[in-house]
Amino acid sequence: MLKWYVINTKANNELLAIKKLKKENYNVYCPMYLSVVKHARKIRKILKPFFPGYLFIRLDIEKDSWISINYMIGVKKLLDDGKFPTALDHGIIDEIMLKIN
């Protein structure tokens, strides 16, 4: 059964991890917001993650090869309880998507 899990990424590597995970056909979600950055009389708008250092991934841990995720570029680890990844409660990601979009 597909459930949402949390990935802890290496510092400022969310986009790299997303790229690598999507290349392997994983369903990944990283809520972002537009930030205005002022530097040396220039104003830039950049996308930043709402949860820096974290991504959400939708997996079926009984079917998907989740152990390899921990070894992907940009990924620190898939959050777990010591043995298996810890799934988020049903509906949390849906609520985040509704509030952000």
Annotate each predicted stretch with a short phrase.
Residues 1-101:
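Acidic-enriched and Gly/Ser
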